[in-house]
Amino acid sequence: MEFIDNKTIEDFSRDGAVLCKGMFIDWLDKLRIGVDKLIENPSVRERSYTPDDGTAPFFQDLVNWDRIPEFKDFVFKSKLGFYASKLMKSKQSQFFHDHVLVKEPGSSIVTPWHQDKPYYCVDGAQSVSFWIALDDISKEGCLECIAGSHLSNVLHKPKRFNGNDLYENDNSEDVPDINSNRKDYKILSWDIKAGDAVAFDFRTLHGASENVNKNSRRRVFSARIVGDDAVFIDRKGK
């Protein structure tokens, strides 16, 4: 099956985000096993949030591909790099890191609007993150992306998900109040099935609501890739 055709590439270039249906369905079982192993044995980079209202937690951990065999198999044996190169229009793709995000049933934690690039020690125009659903997710609980925001040439101030600034003395622009002005933006979101992937540019503004499903987990494996023009950048203050 051809998951990436010319229209998919055009949509990604224009909007900075595109849904790729069924792209990683053959890897579901392996990635789910890897997520279970990670939750049982998280890394020192694990960052979880427990809501004050007593609802279920939001688990996060990243850069575990080299110690979770199932993740390592996915990175090296799937067509992840091939798909990334096509979307980025890059001759090659370089794996940057993995990121696991699990919102347990009914978790009230909201993922705030942000761009990924300001958090990273990498620069360049060619980038893609595959937000791979390991469970069915309704449009109301899915990732949301602001179409075209990757073309604004603005990198907004990165904040921790608790609202604190990530870097000291950062004078970059705050993320605009999108939720109060949703009609002013073209917001992309989808009803997605397990095995689907949302591919988005590191510069794309995106966020996600609480897990509105009180009976199902919202497990996501994200894989971040960079292209030919990637260079290291030292973002002071972290």
What are the functions of these language-model segments?
Residues 44-53, 156-161, 194-199, 203-238:
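Non-heme Fe(II)/2-oxoglutarate
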Residues 110-118, 145, 205-208, 223, ...:
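Histidine-centered catalytic micro-motifs
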Residues 115-127, 185, 192, 216-217:
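A short beta-loop-beta micro-motif enriched in histidine and acidic residues
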Residues 139-205:
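Double-stranded beta-helix
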Residues 90-91, 117, 133-143, 148-150:
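Active-site region of the double-stranded beta-helix
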Residues 27, 104, 138, 152, ...:
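Feature marks short, surface-exposed loop/turn motifs that line or immediately flank catalytic pockets
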Residues 1-14, 19-113, 119-121:
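Non-heme Fe(II)-dependent double-stranded beta-helix
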Residues 121-138, 224-227:
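Short, conserved beta-strand element in jelly-roll/cupin
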